Amino acid sequence: MNPIILSVSVMLILALLRVNVVVALTFSALIGGLVGGLSLSETISAFEGGLGGGATIALSYAMLGAFAVAISKSGVTDLLAHSVIKRINGKENIHAATGVKYLLLCLILLVTISSQNVVPVHIAFIPILIPPLLQVFNKLKLDRRLVACVLTFGLVTPYMILPVGFGGIFLNNILLKNLHDNHLDVLASQVPLAMALPALGMVVGLLIAVFISYRKPRTYAEVDNSELAPTSVEPTFNKRHIQISILAIIAALSVQLYAGSMIIGALAGFMVFTFGGVIAWKETQDVFTRGVHMMAMIGFIMISAAGFAAVMKATGGVETLVQALSTSIGDNKPLAALLMLIVGLLVTMGIGSSFSTIPIIATIYVPLAIAFGFSPMATIALVGTAAALGDAGSPASDSTLGPTSGLNSDGQHEHVWETVVPTFLHYNLPLIIFGWIAAMVL
């Protein structure tokens, strides 16, 4: 059996059985390596060798976590939570409450989209912003699976279509570069256009989640946790701190764009908060520790996913799988497009990162797409969609780990069944459909 299919299947089964994701990734990597023809020592060596590939991401998230905690020190998130609570107080009318619910969802969506480009903190804002709002969600009887879908949409869709922030990294630095490296002559301006139709599939999935799947109210237990819920006293805000926050955000974005590093960008923003007096010098250690603690589990999962990816590369399972499919397809172009997307789904769900999937599949997909007669635009859509598939819906993806880190602050939101499964169904299925259509019509 192909090691990619087996190892991803084992990982998903273990995750669905509520086994820790780090354990599931490590165990499935061992199984995949042994089935793929590697010895136990070779498998362990490949896994350990790949762990370093996730270190940069883990450190990035630690720095972003510290930056997000610094933002919270300015009082911005408390201001938002209290503003929402004031709006729903006395809103016993069902229509008024519904209006507030959709307004809140739109606000969360805008903040999430902004976290990918305007304020590039990625998922680090979620454990800061969402826990104070859980009390609001409970009062509105808002299904947290819907919030998870909204958050994941905002984390994934922008990088598929907007060539700024993380989208600039995905579309230009990774996707376009790998297409050029594999001798596909395309322009940077063509990449977002080719990804527009697959991104529309994400929009369809979001609308289904909002207006069909999770529109009914859902009741959660009121958990007494003073650290999560905002106080009933109206908070006071230091205008100077708000101004410093804006300056820090601008500095973080500017430095990240200039240096091309989330680590340096987050560090710059953190230092602005420190020199600006929002964080006292004696508090910097505590703030940084809180940020690292907040993002630690996500960092460990991403490191484990890098080890898993290294084992999968060492087995040559992706190449074998694609070759087996290409020989069985014949000259059936529609079937070729569908199977290429499904293989991308399997790879990304195992690795947990669409950014890491592109270098793996582009080397094989570009010549294969050219051989089947796909246009350059269709090839862009195939490779880009195949990589994005699985990012929403993988237990090891930061696009699902981030939402869970905020929504499960009171222990009432399960990662696999209430984040992974809903996002998989609402986003991966439309992505396959719209990605296939894009490959056929472009």
Swiss-Prot record:
Principal location class: membrane
Keywords, in A-Z order: Amino-acid transport, Cell inner membrane, Cell membrane, Membrane, Transmembrane, Transmembrane helix, Transport
Any single Gene Ontology cellular-component annotation: plasma membrane
Domain of life per record: Bacteria
Localization of this protein: Cell inner membrane
Signal peptide: none
Segments traversing the membrane: 21-41, 51-71, 94-114, 117-137, 150-170, 192-212, 240-260, 261-281, 292-312, 335-355, 358-378, 420-440
A GO BP entry: amino acid transport
Keyword Transferase tagged: no
InterPro entries: AA_Transporter-Related (IPR052576), Na/H_Antiport_NhaC-like_C (IPR018461), Na_H_antiport_N (IPR032813)
Function: Seems to be involved in glutamine transport. Complements an E.coli glnP deletion mutant.
Protein's recorded name: Glutamine transporter 1
Organism taxonomic ancestry: Bacteria, Pseudomonadati, Pseudomonadota, Gammaproteobacteria, Vibrionales
